[in-house]
Amino acid sequence: MLDAEQISSLQNDRIKNLVKLRNRRPRDQQRIFLAEGYRAMSRALEKGIVPREIYFSPDWFQGENEMDLLKRAQSQGSKLFEISKIAFEKVAYRDRPEGIIGIISQWNYSIKDLALSNPPFLLIVESIEKPGNLGTILRTADAAGVEAVICCDSVTNL
């Protein structure tokens, strides 16, 4: 059984904050980012990235594994909030919501933190505006064996 706080009001402070977090400035100020959808949340947990908070609405679930994912996240320390269908519709930023949004703390790495070969195989990109373009670049870099991608002057939220 999940231990989740119930939220139904659109006037709830947490819902209002989630709506604000759709914009980059509040996310940067709070040093967090949002991950929406089953796949994003599942991959985060697989990599040891535990969301601070997860907001979910079973009315939007598209599969059968969401509850198991929520149990796993809660066992690793995520605080869960079950929100109404209407509230989720308001906070979701994807065209087709999947019923799960996580708040994850930002982290920073320096090039000194990376274990690179000598000489390193790096890709440096600048002013990537569209998330889809960045995704294509990352997949291509991975396929080519690039060790690190350095994003300069990023317009896309990483």
Question: PLM features: what roles do these ranges have?
Answer:
Residues E98:
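Gly/Ser-rich helix-loop-strand patches that form or flank binding pockets
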Residues M1-D95:
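N-terminal positively charged helical leader segments and presequences
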Residues E46, R72-S75, F81-I86, N108-Y109, ...:
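RNA substrate-binding interface of SAM-dependent RNA methyltransferases
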Residues G102:
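Glycine-rich phosphate-binding loops that contact phosphosugars or nucleotide phosphates
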